[in-house]
């Protein structure tokens, strides 16, 4: 059953996750998904438990139109499927004709965008907002409205634009930090004002870009300020420096804010790798939550701590996100980690012999070689047979 906005009251600590991997994520240069690939990713996202899937921008191409329609036909009974649309009737009609019942309308509200891109006055933009939202509502759509470049919009005009959208019937207001120029303190204050302005009936959403590496931090600040929905992409893919990362935002909401989502967190690693395979964009080695080194340890002090109690050097367990703990060998290794790795191979040595093996491992590593468990095993066996 698709969850509606009415299930998420202002007092609720359950936050909606709006995934835009298939729209904003795919806008990254070099990512061009086929309709079948988009459907496969959408199935994974629905199974993961996101609340909203932005399937595409139906008016932008025939392929986007078909993909949006097919995704809705496949999973529209499991999750809210939404399509992006400019604030004009042609785009709205195209989006409606896909069969979906939710639309994400946007128009820029910053002076910069209005002057150089839209070449429209404030009055013209406000008229577009009212007419497009009302038109979509008159056609029975759930409407989420985004004042594009909201964080660089003059405050009084931003609030006028938001009020105009709500008066026309908008159900949700999304606040995009379009080029990632916010920091958490400012974004918190901004979202707090907007939440208080719109009241409990309207869901406020956050949409953060990563141009200064703050997309996750800003998203969490916005949620902490009262936003009840966060826009994310798997692995943080997207234009320029990318978007707020689904896995980081979800785990931040859960572990740092102590709020809930409907996401099955133990599937995060699996979905991350699936999207990486489909898009051809690898997951960074040091990526938080789902990177291969997110739960990797080499330092002897750290490994000893993790062996005794993993939470000494891990804020969450790898199993909680479907990832794996990796104990590595190198010049920083200690005897406790070496003992554990060898015992997992069925090799048991005295402390004196472990020290000899450890010295050989460090010598190997300091020569610029990557030391594997197999190397340690061979050194140990050679010592045992000597």
Curated annotation (Swiss-Prot):
Keywords tagged on the record: Amino-acid biosynthesis, Branched-chain amino acid biosynthesis, Leucine biosynthesis, Metal-binding, Transferase
What Pfam families does this protein map onto?
A: HCS_D2 (PF22617), HMGL-like (PF00682)
Q: Indicate the enzyme's highest-level EC class.
A: transferase
- Domain spans labelled Pyruvate carboxyltransferase: 15-269
- Residues holding a divalent metal cation: 24, 207, 209, 243
Question: Which reactions appear under catalytic activity for this entry?
Answer: 3-methyl-2-oxobutanoate + acetyl-CoA + H2O = (2S)-2-isopropylmalate + CoA + H(+)
Could you confirm whether the keyword Transferase appears in this record? Answer: yes
Per its UniProt entry, which superkingdom is the organism in?
A: Archaea
Q: What is its EC number?
A: 2.3.3.13
InterPro entries per record: 2-IPM_HCS-like, AIPM/Hcit_synth_CS, Aldolase_TIM, IPMS, LEU1_arch, LeuA/HCS_post-cat, PYR_CT
Q: Give the pathway listed in the UniProt entry for this protein.
A: Amino-acid biosynthesis; L-leucine biosynthesis; L-leucine from 3-methyl-2-oxobutanoate: step 1/4
Q: Which CDD domains match?
A: DRE_TIM_IPMS
Q: Which family does it belong to?
A: Belongs to the alpha-IPM synthase/homocitrate synthase family.
Question: Function of this protein?
Answer: Catalyzes the condensation of the acetyl group of acetyl-CoA with 3-methyl-2-oxobutanoate (2-oxoisovalerate) to form 3-carboxy-3-hydroxy-4-methylpentanoate (2-isopropylmalate). Carries out the first step of the leucine biosynthesis pathway.
NCBIfam families listed in its UniProt record: IPMS_Sufob, LEU1_arch
- Name of this chain's protein: 2-isopropylmalate synthase
Per the UniProt record, the source organism is Saccharolobus solfataricus (strain ATCC 35092 / DSM 1617 / JCM 11322 / P2) (Sulfolobus solfataricus)
